[in-house]
């Protein structure tokens, strides 16, 4: 396909970007406490520049050290000592023809008081005693517990307002002096960016952060000149823009990332915050103020799934927002619209939805997708499946001193080593049993190391349990990972044999140097429970895979994990009256909250009943017997059918059989320990890289 617009240059103010692609900011905790870029951070972004992106906006960059921190390891432009390291970073991006844009950020009410208040003290201490940070991360559970109880520091917000869904438990209204100081912090940070050779700055006015908090009537209840009317709510960002223009000049490219619609109506709160019409009005005012481009986004932490979408959201679903903003401004419009393929990107440019296509997750998943599109190698692009592991891992790992990671791209945060992989496996052979995500990741990693690799999958179709997952409502994109892992493994030299089951004896005959067992898991059906094998009992996978259909019946689903919620969707569609029981005290224990919210949004309209802290003790012909996990109280639920969704147990008997023949094998993925697609891929990669 010809990418006439996607690969064409375009100007943002005085800056010419070589193509229409922008990597948007996504924090990954690759920095360090003092806010200077690490080699690892620069390697990470330079690889995206090598891969052809037009402009890179690294993760959020704090504008001061007292109040503006979101993590202990993000970028900062709060001090003059940041200028020289940032200059080095910019030079590395410029080597490959890309532009560097720094996003200036303050979390406001969506910050965590431990990071915003401890950081000033930590910076000088950690410089002298680096291990102090490790000690702090060990205290994270205690600090978060204190924060949840609201008994430690508060964070800044435009006014005393309700708490965000995720963030601090105490906020305080900024004084007028604090507002003025923060405006000056933004301006000074922008000036340092210009001195460092950064090509552009972006003010983060989206996703519910500080600038948006001033713009929104939901969070701005001030009665002075910074609150009340539309013009007053615009004053905070207007004074920042005026100050940047005064210090950096009118030709220095300035972008605002703008939430065009706070999306409260999507989460059942119509009338709260502001909608698209106000978003358009803000955009027009920003153009009047001299902004060079608007980067259109949506929502805030309260409506998390409407800016960090799970896989159920259609690629491009947000393009109407960009098109509406573009209809009222003449400056370039950048937009991230769940962009997943170059074909989609070109199409949205041709439709006039936007001038630049933006994405963070697509560049996280495949740093070279632009170059691959340019060279006609689209089939080699590793597409983001929207599993949200990058978000989950960052938000979880940042609290304990670790980096974020991608479910499918093993190079994240180790680019130098990954792309300089030594082919130390040549003249050695490897057999991989199973072609799910773990088996295919193992195969590609082995092939990249130079092994001669054969993958054997007994089914006629690769994918393992991903086949079931991709069969669920709006989850078909999950199968992309199998298609792309297959392509990657084959391109690196692995041979994949479908419909080929191998016994231990047959494997032994090939005399492999390495054996990887990726035979997946089997759904649990605890035989200790009376009635577990009754005719009215089936497994969740029986329904998801189309082997069984239950209509217009009373059904009890046992287990409220993501699979349990997915099977509930099927049953609701088939007219069933569903009760979900869960032994844990909450629904979907351990599952990432966005995935749970996504499922529950589709389940709630059907009136499904959830019973937590409830153990299954027996199954009769028309009754499910239960026990309260807290009180021991016995109970019963009328039921025509029971669906079990209790997780999986590893299927790895082949490891023992091979051991009896004197062959060592490593179990990966669900064959080693049940988990997510990300768990499967990373366990396989780590296992292969540990082979000497």
Where do the PLM segments sit?
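Flavin-dependent oxidoreductase catalytic cores
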Residues: 1-433, 437, 442-448, 453, ...
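Rossmann-like dinucleotide/flavin-binding elements
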Residues: 424-455, 497-511, 519-593, 627-641, ...
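Small-residue-rich anion-binding loops in enzyme active sites
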Residues: 368, 373-385, 500-522
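Rossmann-like dinucleotide-binding cores of NAD(P)H-dependent redox enzymes
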Residues: 452-492, 569-614, 672
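Short, structured coil segments at secondary-structure junctions
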Residues: 329, 352-353, 492, 533, ...
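Flanking helices and flexible, charged tails adjoining ferredoxin-like Fe-S electron-transfer domains
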Residues: 241, 415-425, 430, 441, ...
């Amino acid at each position: 396909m010809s990418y006439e617009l996607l690969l064409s240059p375009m100007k943002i103010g005085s800056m010419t970007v070589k193509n229409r692609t922008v990597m948007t900011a996504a924090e990954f905790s690759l920095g360090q406490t003092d806010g200077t870029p690490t080699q690892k951070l620069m390697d990470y972004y330079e690889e995206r520049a090598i891969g052809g992106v037009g402009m890179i906006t690294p993760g959020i960059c704090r504008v001061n050290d007292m109040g503006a921190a979101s993590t202990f390891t993000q970028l900062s432009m709060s001090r003059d000592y940041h200028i020289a390291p940032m200059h080095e970073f910019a030079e590395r991006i410029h080597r490959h023809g890309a532009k560097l844009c720094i996003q200036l950020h303050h979390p406001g009410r969506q910050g965590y008081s431990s990071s915003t208040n401890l950081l000033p003290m930590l910076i000088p201490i950690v410089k002298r005693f680096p291990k102090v940070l490790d000690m702090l991360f060990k205290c994270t559970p205690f600090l978060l517990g204190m924060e949840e109880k609201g008994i430690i520091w508060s964070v800044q917000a435009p006014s005393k307002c309700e708490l965000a869904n995720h963030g601090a438990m105490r906020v305080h209204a900024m004084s007028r002096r604090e507002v003025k100081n923060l405006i000056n912090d933004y301006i000074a940070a922008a000036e340092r960016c210009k001195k460092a050779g950064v090509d552009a700055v972006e003010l983060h006015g989206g996703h519910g952060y500080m600038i948006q908090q001033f713009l929104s009537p939901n969070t701005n209840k001030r009665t002075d000149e910074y609150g009340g009317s539309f013009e007053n709510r615009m004053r905070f960002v207007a004074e920042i823009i005026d100050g940047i223009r005064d210090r950096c000049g009118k030709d220095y490219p300035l972008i605002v990332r703008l939430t065009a619609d706070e999306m409260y109506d999507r989460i059942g709160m119509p009338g709260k915050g502001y909608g698209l019409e106000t978003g358009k009005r803000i955009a027009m005012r920003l153009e009047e103020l001299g902004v060079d481009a608007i980067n259109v986004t949506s929502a805030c932490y309260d409506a998390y799934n409407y800016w960090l979408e799970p896989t159920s959201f259609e690629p491009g679903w947000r393009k109407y927002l960009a098109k509406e903003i573009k209809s009222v401004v003449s400056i370039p419009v950048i937009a991230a619209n769940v962009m997943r393929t170059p074909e989609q990107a070109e199409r949205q440019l041709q439709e006039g939805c936007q001038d630049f296509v933006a994405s963070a997750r697509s560049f996280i998943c495949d740093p070279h997708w632009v170059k691959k599109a340019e060279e006609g190698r689209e089939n080699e692009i590793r597409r983001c499946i929207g599993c949200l592991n990058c978000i989950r891992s960052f938000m979880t790992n940042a609290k304990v001193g670790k980096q974020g990671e991608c479910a499918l791209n093993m190079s994240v945060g180790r680019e130098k080593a990954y792309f300089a992989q030594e082919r130390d496996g040549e003249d050695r052979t490897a057999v991989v049993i199973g072609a799910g995500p773990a088996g295919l990741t193992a195969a590609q990693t082995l092939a990249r190391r130079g092994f001669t690799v054969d993958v054997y999958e007994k089914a006629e179709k690769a994918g393992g349990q991903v086949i079931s997952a991709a069969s669920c409502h709006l989850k078909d994109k999950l199968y992309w990972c199998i298609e792309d892992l297959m392509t990657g493994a084959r391109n690196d030299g692995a041979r994949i044999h479908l419909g080929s089951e191998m016994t231990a004896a047959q494997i032994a005959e090939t005399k492999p140097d390495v054996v990887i067992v990726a035979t997946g898991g089997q759904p649990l059906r605890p035989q200790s429970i009376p009635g577990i094998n009754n005719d009215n009992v089936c497994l969740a996978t029986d329904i998801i895979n189309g082997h069984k259909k239950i209509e217009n019946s009373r059904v009890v689903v046992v287990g409220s994990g993501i699979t349990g919620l997915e099977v509930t969707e099927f049953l609701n569609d088939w007219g069933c009256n569903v009760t979900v029981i869960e032994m844990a005290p909450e629904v979907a224990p351990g599952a990432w909250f966005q995935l749970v919210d996504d499922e529950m949004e589709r389940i709630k309209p059907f009136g499904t009943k959830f019973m937590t802290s409830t153990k299954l003790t027996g199954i009769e012909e028309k009754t499910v017997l239960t026990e309260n996990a807290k009180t021991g109280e016995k109970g019963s639920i009328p039921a025509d059918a029971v669906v079990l969704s209790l997780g999986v147990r590893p299927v790895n008997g082949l490891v023992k059989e091979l051991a009896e023949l004197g062959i060592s094998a490593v179990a990966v993925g669900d064959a080693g320990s049940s988990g997510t697609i990300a768990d499967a891929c990373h366990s396989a990669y780590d296992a292969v890289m540990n082979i000497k």
